[in-house]
Amino acid sequence: NYADRKACTDINIYRQSVDEQFYSYIRPQENGTKSDIRWWKQLNHSRNGLQIVAEAPFSASALHYTIESLDEGIAKAQGHSPEVEKANLTNLCIDKVQMGLGCEDSWGRIARPEYQIPYADYEFTFILTPVKHQVGIE
């Protein structure tokens, strides 16, 4: 749910595995970002991990792919999503804000002005807290 795609999503507590957050688009690309979140908890199979809480709503995603493997620049040499190998890690991205996707009438169109991020200095404060043997949801 990116800035220009989130109007139809409810604010709620959601639970997904990292694998469930990835959508295999034909052309590999970043995806799975959640916007306007208040906190994010990332746990491994042993229920250990991190909780992220920020002073203002933020965006985050977690994938078993590196950014570089999903977007190799203009050449797009990686071809199709099934050709991209999973990384032996969880790539957690924490963002103050992300630009909208655009693509309203074609894939080349940039986001409307209200969904763009003006060039400026930004501050983003968040707290990382270790989580050990988490049981249930808060």
Indicate where each model-derived feature is located.
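Beta-strand/loop-rich accessory regions of lumenal/periplasmic or secreted enzymes
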Residues: N1-E138
